[in-house]
Amino acid sequence: MSILKKSIIASAALALPLAVSANSKLEKMMKDPSQWVQQSGDYAGHRYSTLDQINKSNVSSLKVAWSFSTGVLRGHEGSPLVIGDTMYVHTAIPNIVYALDLNDNQRIIWKYNPVKGGKYPGGETMDRVISVMCCDNVNRGVNYHPNGTIVLHAADTSVIALDAKTGKEKWVTTNLHAGTGKYGVSASTGSGQPFIIKDTVGVGCSGAEFGVRCNWTSYNIKNGKRLWRAYSMGPDKDMLVDPNKTTSMLKPIGKDSS
């Protein structure tokens, strides 16, 4: 891992406790073991549940209670969310989202597919996006905001806010219009989960292997308006860092360090 990446991760870790206290409703939901409201369970990424119905004395006797096929035969990463009595399941490309009723034999309440007319919201075809995706065509999951929104970060980098009850689009924005990378190809893609902080949703991007200048971008959860964007490499004004207060290896990184 590069020093830059270590610095970004350390900065994010320090900021998270403030974000948690600022979104008390989401924090309260995270503490409810009957729900799974964020990828990895909480901001700390513990991936731990306090539910004790399954334990070391009965785990060897587990049997399949039910199963659900998404119909997408690609790699799968990320976890389903459980909000109340509804489970939200996502897929790899084309990034379909399902809402299942856990009280009614996993009935499909709604299904959302961001690919319409063969294209993603940003105008890219599915085949075009697949051609520049690294390491399989996976998606690392949707996330939830307590205002009743499921957020999807699609493979073409679109950020899509869905009504948790109906699956209808609240807003859609294309994070990066696939950009032109070092080798003259549209190379920006999205596979990471959206991250809910206060009343914002943040997303990163992929494509550095094609020369894409990646970044972290924050959007207003209510309307999808872009709030700010910080790049992973300089100059400092584009990284949105204070070179004297941002540290690496316990020392200030200094002006234009990248």
What are these language model-derived features?
Residues N23-T70, R107-S131, K168-H177, K225-G234, ...:
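Aromatic (tryptophan-biased) beta-strands that constitute blades/sheets of beta-rich domains
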Residues D101-N105, A164-T166, I221-N223:
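Short loop/turn segments that connect beta-strands within beta-propeller blades
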Residues A13-L14:
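Short, linear, compositionally biased motifs with a strong N-terminal bias
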Residues M1-I9:
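Bacterial N-terminal signal peptides that target proteins for export
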Residues I54-S57, L100, L162, Y219:
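Hydrophobic/aromatic beta-strand positions that recur at structurally equivalent sites within the blades
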Residues L162, C214-K225:
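Beta-propeller blade signature
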Residues P33-S40, G75-I96, D127-V159, V185-R213, ...:
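Repeat-blade elements of multi-bladed beta-propeller folds
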Residues P17-A19:
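N-terminal signal peptide c-region/cleavage motif recognized by signal peptidases
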